[in-house]
């Protein structure tokens, strides 16, 4: 597949190389970045998009299926990003995109391994957006929806990746990727793209309840409805906190 993509890019007038190392090892990840630096002189943009599926209900899931999904999605993204990170920090420029999924952000039956790995992308992004802020390294996450070969590995799901449904074509995800890879990219944000629609999701926290030092289970039970009420809530992230501190410094 890598060679096919290289050929497509070359035929379109671009320049590309293929590296077939596994992202699931630090050695493989480092070789990917080393090859890119050797061929192009640097790394400006990293899109962590390697992925597999091993779908089963949690009761029936073999832990080997858990491990391999974590290795490719979560560890693989972490390894390649770690290899590229010093390059970007040194030149004070970089754009990183983690590919997440609504299966992790919102949940989906039979994808505990995949969902956990994909939600982990948001955790990495949240931290690296803070660490890269002063170095102009911007880090975001994308949850795409498209008709791809990966989706075709789900039992019972039929796709035609060579001739996808026009409204589920991967090219409808591309504008979001280009935005996150551009000089004008935001940072620390999660975007959703697919079917011609683009949106953003975020973490919110409600006002909370103040009880003091004598709080008990019964107190929480009595106020349970108020505790879970999100009608009055505020977007919250470590990045927002740091940005506010910088404004007030």
Predicted regions and their residues:
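A short, exposed helix-loop element centered on a Lys and neighboring polar residues
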Residues: 81-82, 126
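The catalytic Tyr-X3-Lys active-site helix of short-chain dehydrogenase/reductase
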Residues: 71, 104-107, 112-120
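Substrate-binding pocket helix/loop in short-chain dehydrogenase/reductase
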Residues: 57-58, 62-67
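C-terminal helical subdomain
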Residues: 141, 161-248
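Residue(s) in the substrate-gating loop at a strand-loop-helix junction
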Residues: 101
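The beta1-alpha1 cofactor-binding region of Rossmann-like NAD(H)/NADP(H)-dependent oxidoreductases
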Residues: 20-34, 63
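Active-site-adjacent segment of SDR/Rossmann-fold oxidoreductases
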Residues: 106, 122, 127-137, 183-185
């Amino acid at each position: 597949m890598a060679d096919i993509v290289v050929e497509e890019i070359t035929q379109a007038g671009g320049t590309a190389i293929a590296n077939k190392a596994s992202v699931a090892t630090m050695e493989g990840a480092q070789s990917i970045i080393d090859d890119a630096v050797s061929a192009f002189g640097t790394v400006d943009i990293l899109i962590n998009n390697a992925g597999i599926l091993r779908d089963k209900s949690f009761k029936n899931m073999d832990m080997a299926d858990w491990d391999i999904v974590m290795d490719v999605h979560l560890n693989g993204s972490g390894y390649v990003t770690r290899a590229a990170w010093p390059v970007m920090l040194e030149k004070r420029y970089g754009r990183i995109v983690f590919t997440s999924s609504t299966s992790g952000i919102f949940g989906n039956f039979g994808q505990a391994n995949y969902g956990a790995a994909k939600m982990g992308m948001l955790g990495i992004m949240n931290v690296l957006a803070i660490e890269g802020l002063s170095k102009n390294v911007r880090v975001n996450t994308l949850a795409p929806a498209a008709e791809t070969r990966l989706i075709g590995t789900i039992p019972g799901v039929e796709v035609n990746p060579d001739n996808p449904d026009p409204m589920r074509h991967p090219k409808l995800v591309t504008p979001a990727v280009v935005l996150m890879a551009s000089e004008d990219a935001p940072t620390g944000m999660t975007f959703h793209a697919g079917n011609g629609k683009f949106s953003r999701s975020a973490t919110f926290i409600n006002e909370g309840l103040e009880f003091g030092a004598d709080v008990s289970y019964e107190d929480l039970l009595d106020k349970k409805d108020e505790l879970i009420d999100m009608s009055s809530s505020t977007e919250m992230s470590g990045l927002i906190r740091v940005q506010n501190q910088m404004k007030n410094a």
